[in-house]
């Protein structure tokens, strides 16, 4: 059995760690509230732009736009969104595992890594990384999404990749986050609300007049769709990260409390044994003198 001095040292160490994990849980909870508000605000706009896009694409079906045109897939690009830091449970590992299972052993893959964890992992794996974005911070701006979207569209339009998959973590609650994958480019013909469902809906369907031209309208709208999808993915991922961190730090704090209780019990037993031993020695000494 460890000595009382060793047990006291372990208790002090665990209490110190417990204070850190408790503080991290509280910070993550505060950040989660802000991130969750942004996600809730962004979702309706993302859904709306998908619906508008599907109707416009259906109305301008004779227009060939580079971001809509499907071509033979020789190289696939993955936009992988993780965190810069750890201590957030399985948040990073789940995304990395999902992508790694798809691209393991393949040479026809290019990556755009958002977050230090994905960049470092796939760099060690020797994968081709076209661009990486780290240190985005807690306050995700639309400008960050535009920068990433511009790079992704450049890779696609130049033919570096023939298809782009967006992989991120969708936020449901502080306890539930799910890794998801969606095709970003070419933009699916039925992105979000499908053109068919629009046609099947009751009531007369709107007739669109494109000014100055269908090409000009789509040139403006399609990049905004890509930017918005990446922006929403960044917000969903940030909220998921904070939710996972809050949960992980809460579990760590509870585990520390349990360990402290067990060690305290061990310490009390060791102290009781030491006292009993001292009493026995005193009694034994007195008996010997008598």
Swiss-Prot record:
An annotated GO cellular component: proton-transporting ATP synthase complex
Subcellular location: Cell membrane
Keyword terms: ATP synthesis, Cell membrane, CF(1), Hydrogen ion transport, Ion transport, Membrane, Transport
GO biological process, one term: proton motive force-driven plasma membrane ATP synthesis
GO molecular function (one): proton-transporting ATP synthase activity, rotational mechanism
PROSITE patterns, sorted: ATPASE_GAMMA (PS00153)
Protein's membrane topology: Peripheral membrane protein
UniProt cross-references to SUPFAM superfamilies, sorted A to Z: ATP synthase (F1-ATPase), gamma subunit
Keyword Cell membrane applies: yes
Function: Produces ATP from ADP in the presence of a proton gradient across the membrane. The gamma chain is believed to be important in regulating ATPase activity and the flow of protons through the CF(0) complex.
NCBIfam families with a match to the protein in the record: ATPsyn_F1gamma, PRK05621.1-2
The protein's assembly and partners: F-type ATPases have 2 components, CF(1) - the catalytic core - and CF(0) - the membrane proton channel. CF(1) has five subunits: alpha(3), beta(3), gamma(1), delta(1), epsilon(1). CF(0) has three main subunits: a, b and c.
Protein family per UniProt: Belongs to the ATPase gamma chain family.
Protein name (database record): ATP synthase gamma chain
Organism expressing this protein natively: Heliobacterium modesticaldum (strain ATCC 51547 / Ice1)
